[in-house]
């Protein structure tokens, strides 16, 4: 369904209520990335009770696989800019896209599982969400996200970069669900 929305959104007949949201809330198109992240977490080694703490080979393997995602991300940038295809800046920013987001989530999650015991993922997932919400409420992050300044790499890609905390938290939480529901010892 999300794939159809991604293709159909460029046509005038497509109902705007299903298009990506601009500042808050979510729509049918918004849940596509979240579901993809969740599916990746459900089938991950972390969810399957693999011991990864201290395992640098796992981190290296994930990083190698993510190089392909980063290359696809750059190809997407060049293609979109080359054919002058409209790409809403409020989606991910000027240069950011889904492929960079997914690569960062996979690498950061693998790094976390290499450094910490897997039993801490609930705590870390919750802490990331709390920290992000506190930053939105009590720092200038909210104002930064809603201003039109696109000076520098971080400001140009603020939507994609700041979404990483939420996606990493979602990944960790889904790993926990996978471990508890799908892969629990029987």
What is the meaning of each model-derived region?
Residues 1-186:
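Alpha-helical transmembrane segments and their immediate juxtamembrane cytosolic regions
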